[in-house]
Amino acid sequence: MSHNGVRDIDTSDFFSYERLLTDDERHLLRAVRKFMTTDVAPVILEHWSRATFPSEVVPGMRELGIAGLPYHGNGCPGRSYLLDGMIAMELARTDCSIATFNGVHGGLEMGSIYLCGSDEQRERLLPAMARYETIGSFGLTEPQVGSGASGGLQTTARRDGDTWILNGQKKWIGNATFGDLTIIWAKDVGDGQVQRLCGEKPLAGGHRRKTAAQDRVAHCAERPDHT
């Protein structure tokens, strides 16, 4: 099947959303599939057996330019959300861990900075993240309350001059074992509001513990606990 002279590819796209992509977007989708087949598939089983992330594939992802795909400016590609979702599906087709890594880095972390950060933060942080030179991790989930950010967070943040003091536990922090930049969500003891605190590695006074057993699906996605 083809559309506007560009051959469609099988993406398990039961509702034919791929037809809504432009030719350029379809070419990128095809390039992602080729990368996952030729670069990721041959190495992923060995990493799966060790529950380690295949960092050697990150340069290839940099060449594809798929981090923070739907965001505009500061080095971000400014592509469609539809393309972003379909690329996530292509990553997960070969291994869910790669989709998790990119979703945490380019979606949760870059998205938080893009939507909630200051102009200075966006200008300073997003370009290097779009190039995968700075890897982001994301700390929301907690052992006792899951991801209940609206009212259940138990981790607290207390302002001390120009710094914040965090107290609490986080669980399943995507990319935290090797990430350069971590966003921690915590409740401000001053006003009870949820704050987004962005810290560079290593977070002072913190302790990271790699979980003893990764789940079977995203087995190579390193998501440690943090205290």
Across the structure, where does each feature detected by a protein language model lie?
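Intrinsic disorder at enzyme termini
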Residues: 1-24
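Mature N-terminal segment immediately following signal peptide/propeptide cleavage
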Residues: 19-39
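Short secondary-structure junction/hinge motifs that connect adjacent elements
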Residues: 42-64
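Internal helix-loop-helix
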Residues: 63-135, 174-181
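Short Gly/Pro-enriched turn/cap motifs at secondary-structure boundaries
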Residues: 144-148, 172-175, 187-188, 214-221
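Flexible, small-/acidic-enriched active-site or ligand-binding loops
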Residues: 152, 202-227
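A structural signal for short hydrophobic beta-strand segments in well-ordered beta-sheet cores
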Residues: 155-158
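A short core secondary-structure module
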Residues: 162-163, 167-208
